A protein has these predicted regions:
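Extended, low-complexity, polar regulatory segments
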Residues: 1-12
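Hydrophobic alpha-helical transmembrane bundles of multi-pass membrane proteins
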Residues: 33-34, 38-39, 49-55, 84-101, ...
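Conserved small/polar residues in nucleotide/adenosyl-binding loops
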Residues: 319-325
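Juxtamembrane membrane-interface segments at transmembrane-helix boundaries in membrane proteins
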Residues: 13-30, 64-96, 127-144, 175-208, ...
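Soluble secreted/lumenal catalytic domains
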Residues: 21, 27-29, 35-38, 43-47, ...
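Interhelical loop segments of eukaryotic multi-pass membrane proteins
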Residues: 50-70, 116-130, 162-183, 227-234, ...
Length: 329
C-alpha cells in the first residue's frame, strides 16, 4: 500500500497509516488518537459492564471482561464477585479513563492540526530526534528504547501494586499482598509449564524480571549505535513501514494466542470466582474453547469470551507477518 520514493502518491481516507508513514508528526497524531480510543473503550466498557452486572449471578458466569480484571486487582468486589459496599472505586477508574481519553484525543488533534506534520521540521531539537526513518536502525532502535522503558515502568507499577496493595489469591479466597520471587531458574522453567503455574509469587517474579529486561533493553537501545556499517547482511533494505507494522502485529498476535491458552486453563491468574470454570479445547476449522459448566442457551462464561476473542483476534494479527513484509522488500 505504501509507495516509497514517489512524491505524487496520494491516499484515500481508507488507507490508514499509509498516509502518515513518512510524516512522523502525523504518525504520532494517529497513534495518540488511537491510544485515546483504547482508553475510551476501557472507561466506557467498565460503565457498560457495571450497569449490566447482576450480583445474584456468579461473576464468572456473566459476559464480563473488564470487571473480573478489576476484581483480581482487589478493586470493588469480594471473593464471591459481589460488589463490596459500593462501586465508587470502579466508577472512579472508569471516569479517570474517560477523562484520560479526552486528554489523548486533544493530544492527537494538537499533533495533527497545530504541530509540524514531520518532526524533522520541528524547532525543538529533542523532537527532531524522534523523526522516523524506516531504513535507519539507529533511529528506530532509539524510538524502540523509549517504548521499552515505558513498558518496563508499567510492569513495575503492577508488581508494586501486588506488593503494597495486594491482589486476589484464589488459594485463600481473599486479597493479599504478594512479594515477588525472583528465582531465575523457576522463571526460565515456566516457559514450558506456565499454563499450570499456581504461585502468585512466581507470577510476580516473572513480571519483575520482565521489567528488568525491558528497562535494561530500553536503555541499551537508546544509548547504543550500530557497530560497523549497516550492511545488507545485517538487514539493510528489510526495514520499512510495512515490515515494522507486520512484525508488530505478529508480536501482538502471538501474545494474544498465548493469553488465550493461558486464560482458558489457568485458575490462579484467572480465578474461577471471577472468570468461570476452566474451558475444554475443541478443534474444527481452528481451535476453540467451550464451557465445562451448564449455562442457559446463548450465555457463556467470562473465560470463554476472553479465550476465544483473544485467540481469533490474535490469529488475524499474526497473519500480517508475511505478505506486508514480502511486498515491502
Amino acid at each position: 500500500m505504501q509507495t516509497y520514493g514517489n512524491p505524487d502518491t496520494t491516499y484515500g481516507w481508507w488507507a490508514g497509516n499509509s498516509g502518515v508513514a513518512n510524516r512522523s508528526g502525523k504518525f504520532i497524531a494517529a497513534h495518540v488518537a488511537h491510544a485515546g480510543l483504547i482508553v475510551f473503550w476501557a472507561g466506557a466498557f467498565t460503565l457498560f459492564e457495571l450497569s449490566r452486572f447482576d450480583p445474584s449471578v456468579p461473576m464468572g458466569h456473566q459476559p464480563l471482561i473488564v470487571l473480573p480484571h478489576l476484581a483480581t486487582l482487589g478493586i470493588g468486589f469480594d471473593a464471591n464477585g459481589v460488589a463490596m459496599g459500593d462501586t465508587k472505586p470502579v466508577l472512579a477508574i472508569a471516569i479517570v479513563h474517560l477523562v484520560s481519553s479526552m486528554v489523548l484525543a486533544a493530544g492527537g488533534l494538537l499533533h495533527s492540526l497545530l504541530l509540524p506534520g514531520n518532526l524533522e521540521d520541528s524547532d525543538i531539537a529533542r523532537a527532531r530526534k524522534f523523526n522516523i526513518e524506516w531504513d535507519n536502525p539507529d533511529k528506530l532502535t532509539f524510538i524502540l528504547g523509549h517504548h521499552l522503558l515505558f513498558l518496563g515502568f508499567a510492569v513495575i507499577a503492577f508488581v508494586e501494586w501486588a506488593r503494597v496493595h495486594g491482589i486476589y489469591d484464589p488459594a485463600i479466597g481473599a486479597v493479599r499482598q504478594v512479594e515477588y520471587e525472583l528465582n531465575l531458574a523457576k522463571i526460565w522453567n515456566h516457559q514450558t509449564d506456565f499454563l499450570t503455574i499456581d504461585s502468585l509469587e512466581e507470577v510476580m517474579g516473572g513480571h519483575a524480571f520482565l521489567a528488568f529486561v525491558e528497562i535494561t533493553g530500553g536503555a541499551w537501545h537508546i544509548a547504543t549505535k550500530q557497530v560497523g556499517e549497516f550492511t545488507k547482511f545485517k538487514g539493510k533494505g528489510l526495514l520499512s513501514a510495512e515490515a515494522v507494522l507486520s512484525w508488530s502485529l505478529a508480536g501482538i498476535g502471538w501474545m494474544a494466542i498465548i493469553a488465550a491458552f493461558w486464560s482458558a486453563a489457568n485458575t490462579t491468574v484467572y480465578p474461577v470466582e471471577y472468570f468461570g470454570e476452566p474451558l475444554e479445547l475443541k478443534f474444527s476449522i481452528s481451535p476453540y474453547w467451550i464451557d465445562t459448566v451448564d449455562l442457559p442457551d446463548g450465555e457463556f462464561t467470562s473465560r470463554a469470551w476472553l479465550a476465544n476473542v483473544h485467540y481469533y483476534f490474535g490469529s488475524v494479527s499474526y497473519t500480517h507477518l508475511t505478505l506486508p513484509t514480502i511486498y515491502s522488500v
